A protein has these predicted regions:
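Extended substrate/RNA-proximal surfaces in nucleic-acid metabolism proteins
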Residues: 49-180
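Active-site neighborhood of phospho(di)ester-bond hydrolases with catalytic His/Asp-centered motifs
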Residues: 5-6, 37-41, 72-75, 144-146, ...
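Aromatic/His-enriched, Gly/Pro-containing loop or helix-boundary segments
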Residues: 188
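An N-terminally biased module of ancient metal coordination in phosphate/nucleic-acid-related enzymes
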Residues: 1-87
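Short, flexible loop segments at the rims of nucleotide/cofactor-binding pockets, characterized by
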Residues: 12-17, 119-122, 179-185
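Short, intrinsically disordered, charge-balanced linker/junction segments flanking boundaries
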Residues: 191-197
Length: 197
């Protein structure tokens, strides 16, 4: 069994510690028994430079520190748009297979807005379009709806979300292979929704 945390942030995201760096992420992951970490915020220009300086890439999709601790390329993107007469605010975790794909994702996002002001950038892109465009870059990219029950910024959020995965991702639903249930729910709550089976 691998214990992984695939949704983290670097020090350039709002409301994060300035002490967040690769060394501290590794240190505290080991203390907590986490075997694999996401890099967080790979779209942020300063953070991706720290990732490149502190992690070594190989052909497996896993990057490693000098001591061999594994990371996977990961970021979170906030999508804010209107659909069916309602404002939608959906956060998605994105996993990338390598640094070349990260650069292509970043290049695409730069055509839609800024990436330098926050580790979790915001774009006015509907979720189906977002998934479709990322799949044009690489079929190995994973888009994972983040903290799906959070009221304001999630797939099932009561204030700005949807009633089903299909309502949100439409024809791209088949490419959603995982959901992050987040801290706003527990397994018993999630088991009550059959579409999560």
């Amino acid at each position: 069994m691998i214990i992984a945390d695939l949704h983290i942030h670097g020090r350039y995201s709002q409301a994060t510690s300035k002490a967040l760096d690769i060394a501290n992420l590794e240190k505290y992951a080991k203390i907590k028994g986490v075997d694999l970490l996401g890099t967080g915020d790979f779209t942020h220009p300063k953070w991706i430079e720290e990732i490149k300086q502190n992690l070594t890439e190989n052909s497996t999709g896993i990057l490693r520190t000098k001591t061999g601790f594994p990371f996977i390329l990961q970021t979170e993107i906030s999508l804010i748009y209107s659909q069916d007469g309602k404002g939608r605010r959906i956060h998605n975790v994105v996993l990338a297979p390598d640094l070349e794909v990260v650069q292509q994702i970043t290049d695409y996002l730069l055509t839609k807005g800024r990436i330098d002001y926050d580790g979790r950038p915001i774009f006015k892109i509907p979720c189906p379009e977002f998934v479709s465009e990322l799949r044009k870059i690489s079929k190995k990219i994973e888009v994972i709806p983040a903290h799906i029950w959070t009221p304001w910024f999630s797939l099932f959020g009561s204030m700005s979300g949807f009633d089903s995965i299909k309502d949100c991702f439409q024809d791209q639903t088949k490419h959603i292979n995982a959901l992050e249930t987040g801290l706003s729910s527990d397994p018993a709550m999630n088991w009550r929704l059959s579409q999560l089976d």
